[in-house]
């Protein structure tokens, strides 16, 4: 494994998107409060706080486990940083500093911030991988709900202010970036996995995820116009289903029972929006079932909206949005098939043992038990 300049630049771009997303959300929430739209302001701020709190819980949990593994006991300092919501920024500082020394200074430094002897390339890759997992959490816990909320607010009033447009654009960029960056980090940190080489595999994967996600979020927005309670009940049902699926698969990502429970809650929430392999096993059947349900759900929502009185919604937007939903879903499924049929790194690899059963030569790394593609 080798940490490259490309990996370093991806980390730099990652923190730029992270900070921009955070600032845009705060500015928009202030704008809502200033305009007297208190419900939208509270919801916008709540999504930000909820996402960052959960992300920092996982960040501190991982750091605590790493410190205990290294025999260190200086965790109170890091606990304070995470309580002040500075854990992610601290991780970025160490990751960028380490990455800079590795790729530009060609440092042979062998100790990290835990005073542990380690290979600098491995250290830089592990730090970047932890950040990619945290960004993935933040994207689906905060970015996706935020995007649905802002699209709903935009369609309800028929126009968007600059802050709203900024949040929508940054959320789309954050979702796109974190999705691709996570796949690159996943395969970079696990030597037994084939790398995602070239531009086309990354583009196919990005379009598959982004288009299916866009189609579903627009469908949810339409359902919110029909009946907010029905939309929330549907999302709750899907979350519970994903939560139960995580329990059935006996995920083993966290060391503590409480954090594993929280992890399964988050996995259930992520599965509301997109599919991930939560146990590293063959996913052909689960993925087929998932997107079959997604297609049926999307068509059902469009059917309900067509027969519902259009007085609740600006009809000028309905036909373009309906066409966008159908086209995005169709193209997303096509890109899914193209990616797994022609560009997936494991498409020509002989079937092997389950990646999480520990019977094959593997490097001990927490991402091995995280969400796969």
UniProtKB/Swiss-Prot annotation:
Give the record's membrane topology: Multi-pass membrane protein
Q: Where in the cell is it found?
A: Cell membrane
Membrane-spanning ranges:
8-28, 38-58, 166-186, 206-226, 230-250, 256-276, 295-315, 318-338
Q: Which UniProt keywords apply?
A: Apoptosis, Cell membrane, Membrane, Transmembrane, Transmembrane helix
Q: Name the tissues where it is expressed.
A: Highly expressed in the small intestines; weakly expressed in the pancreas, liver, stomach, and large intestines.
* Activity regulation information from UniProt: Activated upon caspase cleavage to generate the XK-related protein 9, processed form. Does not act prior the onset of apoptosis.
Q: Name one GO cellular component term.
A: plasma membrane
Domain of life where this protein originates: Eukaryota
* Predominant cellular place of this UniProt entry's protein: membrane
Family of the protein in this entry: Belongs to the XK family.
Q: What protein does this entry describe?
A: XK-related protein 9
Q: What is the lineage of its organism?
A: Eukaryota, Metazoa, Chordata, Craniata, Vertebrata
């Amino acid at each position: 494994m080798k940490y490259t300049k490309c990996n370093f630049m991806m980390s730099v771009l990652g923190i730029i998107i992270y900070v921009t997303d955070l600032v845009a959300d705060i500015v928009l929430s202030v704008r809502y409060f200033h305009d007297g739209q208190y419900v939208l302001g509270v919801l916008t701020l709540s999504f930000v706080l909820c996402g960052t709190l959960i992300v920092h819980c996982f960040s501190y949990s991982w750091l605590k486990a790493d410190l205990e593994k290294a025999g260190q006991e200086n965790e109170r300092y890091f606990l304070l940083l995470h309580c002040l919501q500075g854990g992610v920024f601290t991780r970025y500082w160490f990751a960028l500093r380490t990455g800079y020394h590795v790729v530009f200074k060609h440092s042979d430094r062998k100790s990290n911030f835990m005073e542990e002897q380690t290979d600098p390339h491995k250290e830089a890759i592990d730090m970047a991988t932890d950040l990619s997992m945290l960004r993935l959490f933040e994207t689906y816990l905060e970015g996706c709900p935020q995007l649905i909320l802002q699209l709903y607010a935009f369609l309800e009033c028929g126009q968007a202010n600059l802050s709203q447009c900024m949040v929508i654009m940054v959320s789309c960029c954050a979702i796109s970036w974190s999705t691709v960056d996570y796949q690159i980090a996943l395969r970079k940190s696990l030597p037994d996995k084939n790398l995602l080489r070239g531009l086309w595999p990354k583009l196919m994967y990005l379009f598959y995820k982004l288009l299916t996600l866009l189609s579903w979020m627009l469908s949810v927005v339409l359902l919110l116009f029909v009946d907010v309670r029905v939309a929330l009940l549907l999302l709750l049902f899907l979350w519970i289903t994903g939560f139960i699926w995580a329990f059935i698969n006996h995920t083993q990502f966290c060391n503590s029972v409480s954090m594993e429970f929280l992890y399964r809650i988050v996995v259930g929430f992520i599965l509301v929006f997109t599919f991930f392999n939560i146990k590293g096993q063959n996913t052909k059947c689960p993925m087929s079932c998932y997107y079959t349900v997604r297609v049926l759900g999307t068509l059902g929502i469009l059917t309900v909206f067509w027969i519902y009185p259009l007085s609740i919604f600006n009809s000028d937007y309905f036909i373009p949005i309906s066409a966008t939903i159908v086209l995005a879903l169709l193209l997303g499924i096509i890109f899914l098939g193209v990616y797994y049929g022609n560009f997936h790194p494991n498409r020509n690899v002989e079937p092997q043992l389950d990646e999480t059963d520990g019977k094959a030569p593997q490097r001990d790394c927490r991402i091995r038990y995280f969400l796969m593609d």
